[in-house]
Amino acid sequence: MLKIVFMGTPEFSVPSLEKLIENYDVRAVLTQPDKPKGRGKKLAMSEVKEVAVKNNIPVFQPVKLKNDIEVINKLKEIAPDFIVVVAFGQILSKEVLDIPKYACINLHASLLPNYRGAAPINWAIINGETKTGNTTMIMAEGLDTGDMLLKDEVDIKRDMTAGELHDILMNRGADLLVKTIDEFSKGNIKPEKQGEPETDYAAMLSKDTGKINWNDKSERIYNLIRGLNPWPLAYSSYNDKVMKIHEAKILDAAPEGEPGLITNVDNNGIEVNSSDGKILITKIQFPGKKSMNVGEYIRGNNIDKGVILK
């Protein structure tokens, strides 16, 4: 049975680790150090660590793997056939990349070379793509630049959020990894060099990424709202209060007045002008409050027509 060392941290990595445990001999799991979570700021394990502990697999949590001689020596001792990396959150040194018998394989949630970087799922939706997918590749020292192995294409539906796409790619990625390891270990996959990307780098998201510019077209605003749901969420300023926008629709209507102007509020939502039409905001959240459908929110609170969202 093939020996595997797995490296990953967030929820996206979990189905991959579970599939690897089902199919191979997973000797060790590396994940990021426990982080303070919630109001009590108690240290919490990563989702990946929880799975490893449940399956009695040794866990290592180096702050910086490339500087951790002890962990690197342990990996050399294990002498894995493959190191498999899914959203680990650290760049691997050449010393680590050279450890496995076959290769270090990475699962990346885009059709490489497009959308290299930390947030490929979000940027594919923000940019209005209709297709994306997963790519497995042999890891090189650069970020997401290694030779490609297998791809799996996925359609992005018109109303799909980043959260929904994340879950599809997360589950399909696990199957693609197993297929990649099986075929690669038998010599059935010819690695393919990456060409030049046709898209921008998929940079890490920050809360500022979500600020809506109402001078943009409706399509652009709608894609931003979908692409940042469930985190960090698109937002606008209503009377100097941050209004996070969870859900919206494009209205088939011409703008009335300047961009950002609220032209109507009712149980269906808040109508707002864009540069070329209108957006209907249907689900919102104000600081310290839970998210609510607009119809529910306006039963106890005011959203005034004529206010300009900034």
Curated annotation (Swiss-Prot):
InterPro entries: Fmt, Formyl_trans_C, Formyl_transf_N, Formyl_transf_N_sf, Formyl_transferase-like_C_sf, Met-tRNA-FMT_C, Met-tRNA-FMT_N. Keywords: Protein biosynthesis, Transferase. (6S)-5,6,7,8-tetrahydrofolate binds at S110, L111, L112, P113. It comes from the Bacteria. SUPFAM superfamilies: FMT C-terminal domain-like, Formyltransferase. It catalyses: L-methionyl-tRNA(fMet) + (6R)-10-formyltetrahydrofolate = N-formyl-L-methionyl-tRNA(fMet) + (6S)-5,6,7,8-tetrahydrofolate + H(+). GO terms for molecular function: methionyl-tRNA formyltransferase activity. Belongs to the Fmt family. This is Methionyl-tRNA formyltransferase. It comes from Clostridium acetobutylicum (strain ATCC 824 / DSM 792 / JCM 1419 / IAM 19013 / LMG 5710 / NBRC 13948 / NRRL B-527 / VKM B-1787 / 2291 / W). The gene is fmt.
